[in-house]
């Protein structure tokens, strides 16, 4: 119900759910560093076959942090407005502050998760996803109490994500139709989320990973473009060309993941840097951005 009233999002998520989640994660994180289950061992499976760094980066798509950052900025601004913070400068200030705190907290969280994964050899055998490893690790550390800690972490993490994503989607889609209001979209997306969640994490990842391989590079380049926006001599040219090239090459990465890429194109792409690591889009996208800046200066003159 509080998702339907944006003014209650900050008080519910910011003052109750997120602090409780952070406390549980802090307990787990400290315990992992104090009493790791295993020594750090060499990477295995995909992390051993390819570069551990690039494999980790692509796996990081599943966090959807960049997509969330793009969407949640509007939610923060909307929630602040509902709290009678209407001064644009203050909204920008508070949004930047919230983003800075998020970066610090996420950095600490991921560092703890990195160490957890690196020392999980004792419980990682047979696991099909990171969620299973995390659950086994916590249960091994805390015993019976670990079950309750995991239940709390999963519940709070799911609820905070649900609130943020659903509110962002509701806010976005309500702008395109007066017939379907913000509350309608909140109810609709909540119902869809409930149905889709029944398929389980492993099955969902099989569907979402190819989609993220297509979408996530665009989100990354949009953030990069926004960061250098003031340096772009011809903004429209840089945006259109960079995103177009990113889409083309990220589509190739997505089709490769699905084993649907034509063999001829695959042979050609093996000559491109980072293609075999699943990052075929990176170099072409950055090169296109640089070239668009050079041509933009020429056109401006």
Regions found by a protein language model. Give the residues of each.
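Loop-to-transmembrane helix boundary motifs in multi-pass membrane proteins
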Residues: 105, 159, 173-202, 209, ...
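Membrane-water interface regions at transmembrane-helix termini and the short interhelical loops
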Residues: 1-17, 82-85, 195-206, 223-233
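Transmembrane-helix boundary/entry motifs in multi-pass membrane transporters
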Residues: 93, 134-148, 175-182
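Membrane-helix boundary/coupling elements in multi-pass transport proteins
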Residues: 147-177
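Extracellular/periplasmic helix-exit of transmembrane alpha-helices
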Residues: 104-133
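Membrane-interface loop-to-helix entry segments
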Residues: 3-32, 209-220, 239-246
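A generic transmembrane alpha-helix motif of multi-pass inner-membrane proteins
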Residues: 35, 235-236, 241-301
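Hydrophobic, membrane-embedded alpha-helices of multi-pass small-molecule transporters
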Residues: 29-38, 46-113, 149-158, 244-254, ...
